Regions:
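A short acidic, Gly/Pro-enriched loop at the edge of an enzyme's catalytic core
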Residues: 203-215
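A short glycine-rich, Lys/Arg-flanked "PGG" loop and its adjoining helix->strand segment in the class I
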Residues: 228-243
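Class I SAM-dependent methyltransferase SAM/SAH-binding core
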Residues: 147-149, 155-204
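Amphipathic alpha-helical dimerization/coiled-coil segments
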Residues: 73-124
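N-terminal helix-turn-helix DNA-binding core of bacterial DNA-binding proteins
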Residues: 2-42, 65-73, 136
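Beta-hairpin "wing" of winged helix-turn-helix
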Residues: 53-62, 69
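C-terminal alpha-helical "lid/dimerization" subdomain adjacent to the S-adenosyl-L-methionine
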Residues: 243-299
Length: 317
């Protein structure tokens, strides 16, 4: 009872309710919150500290910055916010200001990538058929996903694609520039309430064992020094019978990809992927190919409750 009372006391203040309402719509840093609410950083920092201590918000460090968001398990926050009137003048003004900031951030991030010449959309940069690849991903994944982690999320495009099918989606990436663009795009599209991004190393995911229903590795492994370790770490966070979907290049002979795009691997065949999946406690269930100048391969695997001794053959479509 005392924990519940402490949470109610923490929420029972106008500024803190406004903070909860904002952070429930997507992760925001202190600077963003100061811009929206028009209050000083020391004042808001005290409010945020109380909300974090009560478990109503979580603080996610990212470099020298930190973002605040409502934890997935904080059902009390959502129950409280559901009772707030949508037409409340202060809350409506906060939403408009937050939307304006999100649009500005998305525009600034996109312009920065274009100015620097960064190939932030790898499917486009390599001339790959993004529409066909996304359709294959959508077909392979369950209709209702539950909890999803997208490892190497980049611009967050996969989170956008699957937003309507997942209860909670988390995109992880090592690049703060990519995360800035992804975070702004998710907020601009109004899906940041249940789709979040976070800085992380693919070999050390900030997630508990068996905590996710689906994990995706899209166009990530060809950059990895240790693809087997990346697959094993993705499998670690999956529940038994959870799904791991790997999307990457099939074997190719385009040496320029190593020089121009820093690829470490010239694609992967079924034998290598199947062996790595098996070593991670997963069984390959299905594989698909998207043909093109560079073929793209999709491998759908299931996390096994017990280890197996030999991989099962993939169903070729």
């Amino acid at each position: 009872m005392e924990h519940l009372l402490a949470q109610l006391r923490a929420a029972a203040e106008p500024t803190r309710l406004r903070l909860l309402a904002l952070c429930a719509r997507g992760a925001l840093c202190v600077t963003d919150l100061c811009d929206v609410l028009g209050q000083s950083q020391p004042r808001l920092s005290r409010h945020l500290k109380l909300l974090v201590e009560a478990g109503l918000l979580e603080r996610v460090p990212e470099g020298a910055n930190a973002y605040f968001q409502v934890p997935a398990e904080a059902t009390l926050v959502r129950q409280l916010l559901a009772r707030l009137p949508e037409q409340d003048a202060a809350l409506a003004a906060d939403r408009r200001q937050a939307a304006r900031i999100a649009a500005e951030r998305a525009r600034a991030a996109s312009e920065a990538f274009r100015r620097d010449g960064a190939d932030w959309d790898e499917l486009r940069a390599l001339g790959l058929p993004a529409g066909e690849i996304e359709a294959a991903i959508a077909a392979l994944l369950p209709a209702q996903i539950g909890r999803l982690v997208d490892i190497g999320t980049g611009t967050g495009r996969l989170l956008e694609l699957l937003a309507d099918r997942t209860g909670a989606a988390l995109g992880l990436d090592a690049s703060r520039d990519m995360l800035a663009l992804a975070r702004a795009r998710l907020a601009e599209r109004g899906i940041a309430g249940h789709c979040a991004v976070r800085q992380a190393d693919m070999y050390r995911l900030p997630l508990a064992d068996s905590s996710q229903d689906v994990a995706t590795l899209q166009m990530v492994l060809h950059y990895a020094e240790e693809p087997a370790a990346a697959i094993a770490e993705a499998a670690r966070v999956l529940r038994p019978d959870g799904m791991l979907l790997v999307i990457d290049l099939a074997p190719h002979s385009l040496a320029e990809l190593a020089a121009r795009h820093a690829h470490r691997w010239a694609g992967f065949d079924d034998s290598a992927i199947g062996e790595w999946l098996l070593g991670a406690g997963c069984a390959l269930r299905e594989a698909r190919t998207i043909p093109g100048r560079i073929a793209v391969r999709l491998w759908a695997a299931q996390r096994l409750p017990v280890p197996v001794r030999s991989p099962e053959p993939a169903l070729e479509l």
